């Protein structure tokens, strides 16, 4: 085995402990990760600001600057932050607002700050929130959406629209790797639906999940759902199928691609309610060695070996909605958030321990073509994927604060980080 030079060993140790280089000096926060530190791209820096959580998933700020965290298996926490500028933040208080071990992922807060929404596998709850006292009265809990229980994919992502603040979107995944019930729109499986919560009177029963406006179906597990602030476009990121074969040949290593899907604009039926193909059709990522490739290109849909009789590659590309972009197989995208001018979407890749950016144009669409394999640009990565998933950060939820810093959760490590663009080359302080 070749021996590394002393300076190489020192550099490797430095990256392990501190990331690609040192971030701004911060005397109020000396937290460090206990695994190989993530590496920030040029022009970015990050800092670990909270540890000791159980499994932090969705995160969102309240109007007074408190960071609300859906800590799966615990409930909803509120972190009070001391802000010394840049990435120099630290947590001065960690309070449990809602204690409910059934809460597992979804979290949203109303535009007026007075209502917190959180989800279990079966229900979406609304709680009255007092932002002045930073408290929730548990007796105010009300079920607003119900009847969502299924096995396998049990998270229920929540998004409150900024364009139409009374519209609550809920994403529900499949009950199996390839779920035959998802072929039936009345099953509610593998769908995103929207609900006008302003129409729910105090004495009304909750919405049944399948009663919501259909935003999209044939979506295996679209955990990440986001809204482009410039035009209100709704986007989701799809976790596609595992263990895929094509004409009996194992192609699962690089196919199918994970997906970025467009669902139109709330209040406008164009591009809304379409079927995206699951479980009959999947999107092509790698063409190398793909059986019966024919004229298929990256991003095209192809028929599953288990597809309904009569479904072919041709019908997959004419009868179903194609993804706008595809990503490497099995990166497991879990959230998508846009910057304020809608020029960039940020996406967490839970499976590959990355945070990436995707460029958007003034038309509200990605600037990359549908067949691109380079649309996702790494912002934060793990230095050694051979150590994953046991010894890596695993990003889940994203949220921006009022000055544009990007915060994210890492569920397997129980951590919260802050990430921002900097004037220096790539840096970080794990």
From Swiss-Prot:
Pyrroloquinoline quinone binds at residues 57, 153, 220, 330, 350. One of its GO terms (cellular component) is extracellular region. Ca(2+) binds at residues 240, 242. Glycans are attached at residues 25, 94, 147, 184, 306, 341. Its cofactor is Ca(2+); pyrroloquinoline quinone. Disulfide bonds join 281-316, 388-392. Optimum pH is 4.5. Keywords: Calcium, Disulfide bond, Glycoprotein, Metal-binding, Oxidoreductase, Secreted, Signal. Its main location: secreted. Coiled coil: none annotated. Its EC number is 1.1.99.-. Belongs to the sugar dehydrogenase AA12 family. This is Pyrroloquinoline quinone-dependent sugar dehydrogenase. The lineage of its organism: Eukaryota, Fungi, Dikarya, Ascomycota, Pezizomycotina.
């Amino acid at each position: 085995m070749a021996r590394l030079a002393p300076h190489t060993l020192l550099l490797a140790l430095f990256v392990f402990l501190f990331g690609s280089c040192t971030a701004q000096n911060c005397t109020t926060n000396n937290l460090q990760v206990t695994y190989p530190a993530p590496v920030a791209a040029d022009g970015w820096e990050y800092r670990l600001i909270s540890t000791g959580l159980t499994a932090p998933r969705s995160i969102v700020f309240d109007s007074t600057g408190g960071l609300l965290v859906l800590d799966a298996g615990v409930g909803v926490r509120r972190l009070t932050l001391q802000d010394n500028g840049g990435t120099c933040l630290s947590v001065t208080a960690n309070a449990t607002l809602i204690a409910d071990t059934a809460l597992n992922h979804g979290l949203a807060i109303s535009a007026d700050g007075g209502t917190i929404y959180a989800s279990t596998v079966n229900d979406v709850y609304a709680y009255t929130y007092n932002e002045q006292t930073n408290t929730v009265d548990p007796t105010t809990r009300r079920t607003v959406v119900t009847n969502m229980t299924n096995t396998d994919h049990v998270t229920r992502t929540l998004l409150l629209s900024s364009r139409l603040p009374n519209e609550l979107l809920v994403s529900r995944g499949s009950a199996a790797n390839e779920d035959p019930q998802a072929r039936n729109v009345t099953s509610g499986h593998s769908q995103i639906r929207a609900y006008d919560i302003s129409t729910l009177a105090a004495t009304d029963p909750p919405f049944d999940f399948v009663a919501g406006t259909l935003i999209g179906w044939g979506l295996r597990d679209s955990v990440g759902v986001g809204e482009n602030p410039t035009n209100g476009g709704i986007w989701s990121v799809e976790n596609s199928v595992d263990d895929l074969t094509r004409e009996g040949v194992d192609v699962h290593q690089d196919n199918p691609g994970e997906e970025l899907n467009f669902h139109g604009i709330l209040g406008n039926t164009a591009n809304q309610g379409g079927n995206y193909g699951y479980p009959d059709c999947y999107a092509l990522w790698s063409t190398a060695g793909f059986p019966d490739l024919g004229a298929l290109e990256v991003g095209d849909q192809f028929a599953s070996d288990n597809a309904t009789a009569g479904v072919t590659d041709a019908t997959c590309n004419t009868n179903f909605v194609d993804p706008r972009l595809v990503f490497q197989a099995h990166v497991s995208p879990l959230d998508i958030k846009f910057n304020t001018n809608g020029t960039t979407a940020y996406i967490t890749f839970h499976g590959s321990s990355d945070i990436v950016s995707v460029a958007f144009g003034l038309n509200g669409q990605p600037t990359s073509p549908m067949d691109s394999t380079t649309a996702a640009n790494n912002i934060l990565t793990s230095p050694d994927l051979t150590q994953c998933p046991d010894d890596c950060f695993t990003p889940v939820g994203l949220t921006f604060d009022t000055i544009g810093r990007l915060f994210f959760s890492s569920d397997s490590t129980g951590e919260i980080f802050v990430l921002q663009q900097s004037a220096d080359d790539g840096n970080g302080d794990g």
